[in-house]
UniProtKB/Swiss-Prot annotation:
InterPro entries: DRICH1-like. This is Uncharacterized protein C22orf42. It comes from the Eukaryota. The gene is C22orf42.
């Protein structure tokens, strides 16, 4: 009974401070029961100990200053667990590791930034390589095709101009020839010769020679045809030169 210690917080609190434990010596507020019995008045009933707020505050601060062990986070089941698992897989594919396996955040940022730069540079280099490795034959073919098109267009334009000039020269030459040919004297001589050719004597000789071969009705029709031809020739001679040139071009 003499070796037993009592806590400064009192038996009613149900607490024991670190100083009042059996393996630690008594605190300055704890006393041995013999000294307490010597100083305490002789009374049959013991008074309850008062709660010391300072000691309680010191105990709380001591508890808070103790090192805490980190708690492992439990993965939730269901959709959240699957999403976290897929996130880890995606991170591993892209070379991004979670903060648990990597020490400082600067290394993570540097690695992520480096990975992004490498991906961007690779994406830029691939189209540049494709563009550089294009065959030069396409460029040569396109240039050759453009030159050929220009040459053919120039040739077609020159040919069209040449044909147009030829038509103009031909029409001018024809008009000049017809003007020289269809002079007034020539037209008069032609009309006179036609009149002399279609005289009554010629018609009589024709009729006499054809009487043995055809009937009078056929001879009459043939004579009318000749008269129509003569009228048409005279009308053509009286027409202007431009209409005569157009008639010749139509033929």
């Amino acid at each position: 009974m003499g070796s037993k210690l009592t806590c400064c917080l009192g038996p009613s609190g149900g607490l024991n401070c670190d100083c009042c434990r059996p393996d630690v010596g008594p605190c300055h507020e704890c006393e041995i029961p013999e000294t307490v019995a010597a100083t305490a008045p002789a009374s049959t009933t013991a008074k309850p100990a008062k709660l010391d707020l300072k000691a309680k505050k010191a105990q709380l601060m001591q508890y808070l200053s103790l090192p805490k062990t980190p708690k492992m986070l439990k993965m939730s089941k269901g959709l959240d667990a699957r999403s976290k698992r897929w996130l880890k897989i995606i991170w591993r594919r892209h070379g991004i590791w979670p903060l648990e396996n990597i020490g400082p955040t600067e290394d993570v940022q540097a690695s992520a930034h480096g990975g992004v730069e490498e991906n961007m540079t690779s994406d830029i280099e691939i189209p540049e390589a494709k563009h550089d490795h294009r065959p030069t034959e396409d460029v040569q073919v396109s240039a050759h095709g453009g030159v050929e098109e220009n040459i053919t267009s120039d040739i077609e334009i020159s040919e069209a101009k040449h044909d147009h000039h030829l038509v103009e020269d031909l029409s001018e030459s024809l008009s000049v020839c017809l003007e020289d040919f269809m002079t007034s004297d020539l037209s008069e001589s032609l009309s006179v010769s036609l009149e002399d050719f279609m005289t009554s004597g010629l018609s009589e000789s024709l009729s006499v020679s054809l009487e043995d071969l055809m009937t009078p009705e056929m001879a009459k029709e043939r004579y009318e045809d000749y008269l129509c031809w003569v009228k048409m020739a005279r009308s053509r001679l009286n027409e202007p030169i431009s209409s005569q040139v157009l008639g010749l071009l139509r033929l």
